Amino acid sequence: NHIYEIAQASKCYHPGIHMIGVGMEARHNLIHDCPHTAIMFWGNEMKVTDNELYRVVLETGDAGAIYTGRDYTFRGNEVSHNYIHHLGGVGFGAMGIYNDDTVSGTVMRNNYFESLTRGVMMGGGRDFVVQNNVFVKCDPAISFDSRGATPHKVWSKGMVKNMRPRYYFIERYPHCDSTTERNDRAKKLHEGEYASALDAPYITRYPELAAYQEFFKLQEHETSVRLPGQALVENNVFIPRTAFRYRWDDSTKTLYDRGKEVKATRQLLAYVEDFGRNIKRTIDGRMGDLRLSSNFVGMP
């Protein structure tokens, strides 16, 4: 499909493709000249592959060419083999792939990002995979934070109010979340309208969801849930000055690599930003040619 110049009357959250449910695919689409997001998805086992997205987020900011958010139970979603380039974005800018507010589990492989604010944004979630991507003129290439673990009252209350109910009461329409609906969930769960992440088929297909139960054992009125971020990032190619921008929980000041605590050395901090202070790498003048040699191996 060729999709362009949409959302003329209502600019926000009217993407070219909007997928809600399970097992849908957005494949071989050319989407451009949109005021906001190109592709949005909510659910499980979604695939966004082989698309070219450019000149989107032209009249808005804090948005992504591809967007999903706010649910730990979204699993099996893959974004791969997409060419995402030359985005707009005002204020907070435009992201290539925007994983918002602790959504988790997105697999992002073999994408090419060029000329945008952040290539991949992971907003406090867990179980991400970022492999074999190329980042050109994105600063930073990858942004990752621990908003799910911060003690700040805005995020800690949000964890209890939004994320905890979506773990125990998986709704038929995951982005519908009125106050009335939330208050009625417990009754509907017993009537079979809702399922829990600990029930089949969720826990059977995604056994990693069981780990979240430990974090959600607090009572409903508590506001101190802590869910640290986690991601596998490997074999990517970084051209930008800043490869990673990472914001951690100020109460721990700890970095981990593959489950082991690591010291914040100068070499490591070349790829990490601590609370907004960029530590930038030197760009080789030879990088004017952005083609890769046939035997090029990405950063481990």
Where are these regions (language model features)?
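Sequence-level detector for tyrosine residue identity
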Residues: Y4, Y13, Y54, Y67, ...
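Long hydrophobic alpha-helices with heptad-repeat/coiled-coil character
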Residues: N1-I39, D100, E171-C176, R182-A195, ...
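Long intrinsically disordered, low-complexity regions that are acidic and Ser/Thr-rich
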Residues: P151, W155-S224, A243, S251, ...
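Aromatic-enriched hydrophobic runs in primary sequence
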Residues: H14, H36-A38, R75, S80, ...
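Glycine-rich beta-solenoid repeat tracts in large extracellular/virion proteins
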Residues: S10-I20, T37-G43, G61-D71, V90-T102, ...
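Right-handed parallel beta-helix
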Residues: N1-A7, I20-H36, N44-L58, F74-G88, ...
